[in-house]
């Protein structure tokens, strides 16, 4: 085996030969088009890293038993994916060194190509757990998969990648929720124990609302303002109970509601009693999941603002509504909605209900779930 050089190991020669544009001739590519190509190639490499880290975290949570030290490894992978998204955000600044006129000089050569055809970005969405019925149509009435097809309707290599990802296995969300449903709530996984904890917590939520209302009264707020707060707190209390007891969907069967209660109770339990040793890493995992989704939402928003700054609100090269579509994805593409909702229900430490089996969450060698 010959000695390895940096140039050969990184395959720089091959990388530097990939900026030839539509005709494969780099001599015909101007500096602005070269910038466009390189930045998007770098994005695809970042997406590859994110997919690797998310797959690792998903596979870890897919195990029947997840040892505590492995949760730390999952957190590390999620934090790396977060760091990659944050770094990718900086690349939009490089793109913004290109003016609208610069881009328009070569934009028509891209048609009907579109960033929407990034199979790896679609893979990230699928791996996270974005459902088909939650997607925004890229064109009038069209499936996101239609945009990945070749002009003649045949499947492209990008379409095959997405199909393979869908067939490969469960999403990170599915595995996370399955893992959460196994976390003992106050020492027990029994549905009755879960419901008892939730009832106790709902009682604490209502007591906290009453305390806040009394504070408003004591500070001599105007009667109309007090009544407005009273109505708001009552609505919040009803919403909290409906969510925690999984009663928001009257069509859901008893088993579905039971599973939702277990997951939501676990989210609330881990966040509320995070000082307990065995809940420390689970809490870091949930925090990392939220930060991951936040970093992707920020990336989507930054992407939309970069596009708007350069070309305004033109129709996209692939026929989409352009910036309007990008803005909608930034607003509506939320995967871990229950985690975000739980943040609205957290109480200060002195207000959370006491638990009976706190000692069972002390340091131990065995896995929590």
UniProtKB/Swiss-Prot annotation:
Heme binds at residue 303. Binds 1 heme group per subunit. Pathway: Amino-acid degradation; L-tryptophan degradation via kynurenine pathway; L-kynurenine from L-tryptophan: step 1/2. It catalyses: L-tryptophan + O2 = N-formyl-L-kynurenine. Keywords: Dioxygenase, Heme, Iron, Metal-binding, Oxidoreductase, Plasmid, Tryptophan catabolism. Its EC number is 1.13.11.11. One of its GO terms (biological process) is L-tryptophan catabolic process to kynurenine. It is an enzyme of class 1 (oxidoreductase). Substrate binds at residues 36-40, 107, 317. One of its GO terms (molecular function) is tryptophan 2,3-dioxygenase activity. Its cofactor is heme. Pfam families: Trp_dioxygenase. InterPro entries: Trp/Indoleamine_2_3_dOase-like, Trp_2_3_dOase. PANTHER family: TRYPTOPHAN 2,3-DIOXYGENASE. Belongs to the tryptophan 2,3-dioxygenase family. Homotetramer. Heme-dependent dioxygenase that catalyzes the oxidative cleavage of the L-tryptophan (L-Trp) pyrrole ring and converts L-tryptophan to N-formyl-L-kynurenine. Catalyzes the oxidative cleavage of the indole moiety. This is Tryptophan 2,3-dioxygenase 2. It comes from Ralstonia nicotianae (strain ATCC BAA-1114 / GMI1000). The lineage of its organism: Bacteria, Pseudomonadati, Pseudomonadota, Betaproteobacteria, Burkholderiales.
């Amino acid at each position: 085996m010959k000695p390895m050089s940096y140039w050969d190991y990184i395959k720089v020669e091959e990388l530097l030969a990939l900026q030839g544009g539509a005709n494969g001739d780099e001599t015909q590519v101007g500096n602005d088009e070269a910038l466009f190509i390189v930045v998007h190639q770098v994005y695809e490499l970042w997406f590859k890293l994110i997919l690797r880290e998310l797959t690792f975290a998903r596979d870890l949570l897919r195990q029947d038993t997840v040892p505590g030290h492995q949760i730390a490894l999952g957190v590390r992978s999620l934090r790396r994916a977060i760091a990659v998204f944050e770094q990718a955000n900086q690349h939009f600044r490089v793109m913004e060194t290109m003016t609208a006129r610069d881009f328009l000089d070569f934009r028509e050569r891209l048609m009907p190509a579109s960033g929407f055809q990034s199979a790896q970005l679609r893979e990230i969405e699928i791996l996270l757990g974005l459902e088909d019925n939650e997607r925004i149509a890229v064109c009038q009435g069209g499936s996101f998969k239609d945009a990945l097809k070749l002009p003649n309707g045949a499947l492209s290599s990008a379409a095959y990648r997405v199909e393979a990802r869908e067939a490969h296995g469960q999403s990170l969300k599915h595995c996370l929720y399955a893992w959460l449903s196994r976390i003992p709530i106050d020492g027990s996984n029994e549905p009755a124990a879960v419901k008892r904890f939730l009832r106790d917590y709902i009682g604490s939520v209502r007591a906290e609302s009453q305390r806040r209302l009394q504070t408003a009264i004591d500070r001599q707020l105007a009667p109309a303002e007090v009544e407005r707060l009273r109505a708001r707190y009552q609505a919040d209390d009803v919403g909290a109970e409906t969510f925690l007891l999984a009663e928001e969907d009257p069509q859901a069967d008893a088993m579905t509601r039971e599973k939702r209660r277990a997951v939501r109770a676990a989210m609330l339990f881990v966040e509320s009693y995070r000082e307990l040793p065995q809940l420390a890493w689970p809490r870091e995992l949930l925090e990392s999941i939220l930060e991951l989704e936040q970093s992707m939402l920020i990336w989507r928003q930054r992407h939309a603002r970069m596009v708007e700054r350069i070309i305004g609100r033109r129709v996209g090269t692939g026929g989409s509504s352009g910036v309007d579509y990008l803005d909608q994805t930034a607003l509506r593409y939320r995967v871990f909605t229950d985690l975000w909702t739980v943040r609205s229900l957290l109480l200060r430490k002195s207000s959370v209900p006491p638990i009976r089996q706190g000692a069972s969450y002390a340091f131990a060698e065995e896995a929590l779930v």
